[in-house]
């Protein structure tokens, strides 16, 4: 009987441990799936719309600068750096999901020409690895190796993100040619204001959904507010929910209008996009150019020598 109870206790403990582990996994996965740039990957087949707009701007409403630096020309089957710069004031703090203030994170999406892709680790030089740091890049889609995403990562450490890119070789990829190609980039700093389902985050302004008198402001136990508005025209009560972390601009008894801001704007981040051009250069063309320049230099040297020889002959004839 005692042995049976022992086995029963062990079975219950194992079941409880599995349940706890599964719960932790689900919570962890959910927090990861809610991170940039997963939203874009889950909801858009291509991050760049036909208009040229990058879809990250649908959630990050403020417009901020972003810059990209790439070489003017690259040779086939070589590795080069694409440096994305996401500048912002490092002293700024953003409202986190729990309502507290914290440092800003950054993220980026890099849209390369077809055939260009993330360089394999064995092709990246030690100097470039040092610039990359501990960043882990991923493809936007398994079949879209030319679109790379990164983030969220700490902005104070990675306001400049170095992408190691492998240029294609037209000799092995017939879909690639020696041409000038565009590169597009999008970069954000800080959290977004809108979730993909259209709901607001706590990193944006909340406006009144009705006009009237504020009859009550209830501070919720876990943070945030419930604001009760009495419509002056019909006496109907409307309750606006304000999430935690936001600063109220209104008070009880105040008369407000429809869409009047109830909170200040906490957003200190924003999204920006840019572009650059890169030329995939034919090595034979480079060799031909070098040969041409060399022949021009040699021709100039021969002309100078010939001129000096002619001057010597003239000088000797005059002396004679």
UniProtKB/Swiss-Prot annotation:
- Identification of the protein by name: Cytochrome f
InterPro entries assigned to the protein according to its UniProt record, in alphabetical order: Cyt-f_TM, Cyt_f, Cyt_f_lg_dom, Cyt_f_lg_dom_sf, Rudment_hybrid_motif
Matching entries from SUPFAM superfamilies are given as: Cytochrome f subunit of the cytochrome b6f complex, transmembrane anchor, Cytochrome f, large domain, Rudiment single hybrid motif
Instruction: Please tell me where this protein is predominantly located.
Output: plastid
PANTHER family in alphabetical order: CYTOCHROME F, PTHR33288
Function of the protein = Component of the cytochrome b6-f complex, which mediates electron transfer between photosystem II (PSII) and photosystem I (PSI), cyclic electron flow around PSI, and state transitions.
Which metal ions or organic cofactors does this protein require, according to UniProt?
heme
> What biological-process GO terms show up in the record?
photosynthesis
User: Where along this sequence does the record place binding of heme?
Assistant: 36, 56, 59-60
How are cofactors bound according to the entry's free-text note?
Binds 1 heme group covalently.
Q: Where is the signal peptide?
A: 1-35
Which Gene Ontology molecular-function terms are recorded? Answer: electron transfer activity; heme binding; iron ion binding
Note the superkingdom of the native organism.
Eukaryota
Segments crossing the lipid bilayer: 286-306
The listed locations are:
Plastid, Chloroplast thylakoid membrane
Task: Identify the Pfam families for this entry.
Answer: Apocytochr_F_C (PF01333), Apocytochr_F_N (PF16639)
Membrane protein topology class:
Single-pass membrane protein
Taxonomy-wise, where does this protein's organism fall, top ranks first? Eukaryota, Viridiplantae, Streptophyta, Embryophyta, Tracheophyta
Q: GO terms for CC?
A: chloroplast thylakoid membrane
Q: Keywords, A to Z?
A: Chloroplast, Electron transport, Heme, Iron, Membrane, Metal-binding, Photosynthesis, Plastid, Signal, Thylakoid, Transmembrane, Transmembrane helix, Transport
State the family it belongs to. Answer: Belongs to the cytochrome f family.
